[in-house]
């Protein structure tokens, strides 16, 4: 969640695969909350996974504090659980995956692709493997 854009991703119903959905322009907080409320109403997620911009040394800096403050506004208006995930290197990983797949920034914006990376990391960590060798 940046100062200008918010990348949004969704998982499939089985919570196996995350895909980029959309990017939202970050206007004033009220308008941004309204846009996220509309997405939540449409897609009805079980929870929101929000990327937290932790500093390289692992500390919570000013940008992470902004994200937490905005998330507080979201939690007041939504009846949806919010989980924070470290978003360090998610944009780099998203760009690598887009390059590997032949997609470029015109096809999928970095922000939405990074949101999918963050969500996929959460899904991989919380869902046990479906198949055992």
UniProtKB/Swiss-Prot annotation:
Record keyword Nuclease present: yes
Entry GO terms, CC: cytosol
Enzyme class: hydrolase
InterPro entries: RNaseH-like_sf (IPR012337), YqgF (IPR005227), YqgF/RNaseH-like_dom (IPR006641), YqgF/RNaseH-like_dom_sf (IPR037027)
GO molecular function, one term: nuclease activity
NCBIfam families: RNAse_H_YqgF (TIGR00250)
Function recorded in the entry: Could be a nuclease involved in processing of the 5'-end of pre-16S rRNA.
Name of the protein in its database record: Putative pre-16S rRNA nuclease
Species of provenance: Dehalococcoides mccartyi (strain ATCC BAA-2266 / KCTC 15142 / 195) (Dehalococcoides ethenogenes (strain 195))
């Amino acid at each position: 969640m940046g100062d200008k854009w918010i990348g949004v991703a969704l998982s499939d119903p089985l919570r196996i695969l995350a895909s980029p959905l959309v990017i939202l322009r970050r206007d004033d907080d009220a308008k941004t909350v309204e846009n996220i409320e509309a997405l939540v109403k449409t897609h009805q997620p079980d929870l929101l996974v929000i990327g937290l911009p932790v500093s390289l040394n692992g500390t919570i800096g000013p940008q992470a504090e902004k994200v937490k403050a905005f998330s507080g506004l979201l939690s007041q208006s939504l009846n949806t659980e919010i989980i924070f995930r470290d978003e360090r290197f998610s944009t780099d990983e998203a760009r690598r995956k887009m390059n590997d797949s032949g997609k470029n920034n015109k096809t999928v914006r970095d922000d939405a692709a990074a949101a999918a990376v963050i969500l996929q990391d959460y899904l991989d960590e919380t869902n046990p493997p479906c198949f055992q060798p």
